[in-house]
Amino acid sequence: MKNLKGIFSALLVSFNEDGSINEKGLREIVRYNIDKMKIDGLYVGGSTGENFMLSTAEKKEIFRIAKEEAKDQVALIAQVGSVNLHEAVELGKYATELGYDSLSAVTPFYYKFSFAEIKHYYETIIAETGNNMIVYSIPFLTGVNMGVEQFGELYANPKVLGVKFTAGDFYLLERLKKAYPNHLVWAGFDEMMLPAVSLGVDGAIGSTFNVNGLRARQIFELAKAGKVAEALEIQHVTNDLIEGILANGLYLTIKEILKLQGVNAGYCREPMTAKATEKQLAVAKELKEKFL
């Protein structure tokens, strides 16, 4: 297994205008992340990949393409979580066969699952695949809030490496790192990387790293070295960029910026807005020229 610490891009997926996967474009996005953004790894099949709007077959295709293009150049994490446990297991087996370094799974959502049910979900995926697991905690979208003791129950399984922590509860983050220092934490909010690194996270997984990965690494390494003031200046610039991206449409804007960099990033998957308006295109161009 490769080192899973450091900067991981939450991989975008290029779609054609009809919603089908644009394989050439996806390969270009993978290459751009590795060759230009110099990332340590890719988190494939997450929210940024518009995963929850895709069929099982499409998810598998994305895992295959990303692995073929990345080869063994960087670490690869496959997000296989689903409200359908059978699908999660099927995807987990497939990604494991492809050679992904670890699986990750979002907490089951929509229905109000008990913690016992959530624990069973993770235990089942691990038992059926034999691969490592990274819990994907994103409470503001799933409604699932777990405390230190509940994470501890999940961590009792030696295959659970840690958590992708996409939450603003930094008290919980600090308590987790203190209670379980040997378990990894990846920061999930790009705009709060500096305080997260100050609290001891081991890496970060972010959507904006597809275009802002070099700055993300600077923040991470400066903060780790105790150069907080320098890291803060870069975080300020990063957050100005993120503010502009969010106001213009997150995934769509990142894709348009990539296109301006010569990457065939394609369209978004409906029911998201698939194609940028002239105004959105102008904003993307302005952000690229100002920040990248």
Swiss-Prot record:
Q: Which family does it belong to?
A: Belongs to the DapA family. NanA subfamily.
Q: Which organism is it from?
A: Histophilus somni (strain 2336) (Haemophilus somnus)
Q: Which GO terms describe its molecular function?
A: N-acetylneuraminate lyase activity
This protein's UniProt keywords: Carbohydrate metabolism, Cytoplasm, Lyase, Schiff base
What positions does the entry give for aceneuramate binding?
47-48, 166, 188, 190-191, 207
HAMAP family referenced in this protein's UniProt entry, alphabetically: N_acetylneuram_lyase
What does UniProt give as the signal peptide span?
Answer: none
The molecule here is called N-acetylneuraminate lyase
State the reactions this protein catalyses.
Answer: aceneuramate = aldehydo-N-acetyl-D-mannosamine + pyruvate
- Give the enzyme's EC designation: 4.1.3.3
InterPro entries for this protein: Aldolase_TIM (IPR013785), DapA-like (IPR002220), NanA (IPR005264), Schiff_base-form_aldolases_AS (IPR020625), Schiff_base-form_aldolases_CS (IPR020624)
Q: Which gene encodes it?
A: nanA
